[in-house]
């Protein structure tokens, strides 16, 4: 399980040094094989260990290519999916097209989200956190049933 937000740097080649605390887990779970794709709703990237991505691919394969909305999701997620292999120094090369999509610069946030990571431009991440907190504090909407059961 991946959790927490960590500031990491992209080098001049677009490589991301995976924090040490995740490396052993990623080598054990996926031999360092990862898949990176776009997020459909946020200006960030999604980074999955290969076995987790394969579950997503199975779900996507069950969608109908005859349904325009389902085909669009397939096209966006699969069309942007890029395999990346962690090197011996624990670095992942993030494809240039993906870096451009999320406007990633040198400093990026690696955000653990259970079975995957999100990759955010640092400033965009901090703005998103602020916006999310503001939205939670100002919302008048009742919590969904599942959120009501979440006891923090």
Curated annotation (Swiss-Prot):
It is found in: Cytoplasm, Nucleoid. Its main location: cytoplasm. Belongs to the MraZ family. One of its GO terms (biological process) is negative regulation of DNA-templated transcription initiation. This is Transcriptional regulator MraZ. It comes from Pectobacterium atrosepticum (strain SCRI 1043 / ATCC BAA-672). Forms oligomers. One of its GO terms (cellular component) is cytoplasm. The keyword Transmembrane does not apply. Negatively regulates its own expression and that of the subsequent genes in the proximal part of the division and cell wall (dcw) gene cluster. Acts by binding directly to DNA. May also regulate the expression of genes outside the dcw cluster. Residues 5-52, 81-124 form the SpoVT-AbrB domain. The lineage of its organism: Bacteria, Pseudomonadati, Pseudomonadota, Gammaproteobacteria, Enterobacterales. Keywords: Cytoplasm, DNA-binding, Repeat, Repressor, Transcription, Transcription regulation. GO terms for molecular function: DNA-binding transcription factor activity; transcription cis-regulatory region binding. It holds the Pfam family MraZ. CDD domains: MraZ_C, MraZ_N. InterPro entries: MraZ, MraZ_C, MraZ_dom, MraZ_N, MraZ_sf, SpoVT-AbrB_dom, SpoVT-AbrB_sf.
């Amino acid at each position: 399980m991946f959790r927490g937000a960590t500031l990491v740097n992209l080098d001049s080649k677009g490589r991301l040094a995976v924090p040490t605390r995740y490396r052993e887990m990623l080598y054990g779970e996926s031999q360092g094989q990862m898949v990176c794709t776009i997020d459909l709703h946020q200006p960030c990237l999604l980074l999955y260990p290969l076995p987790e991505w394969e579950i997503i691919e199975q779900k996507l394969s069950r969608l109908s290519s005859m349904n325009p909305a389902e085909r669009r999701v397939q096209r966006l997620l699969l069309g942007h999916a890029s395999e990346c292999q962690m090197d011996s120094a624990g670095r992942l090369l993030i494809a240039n097209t993906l870096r451009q999509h999320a406007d990633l610069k040198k400093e990026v946030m690696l955000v653990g989200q259970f079975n995957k990571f999100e990759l955010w431009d640092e400033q965009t991440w901090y703005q998103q956190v602020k916006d999310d907190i503001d939205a939670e504090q100002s919302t008048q909407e009742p919590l969904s049933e599942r959120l009501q059961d979440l006891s923090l």
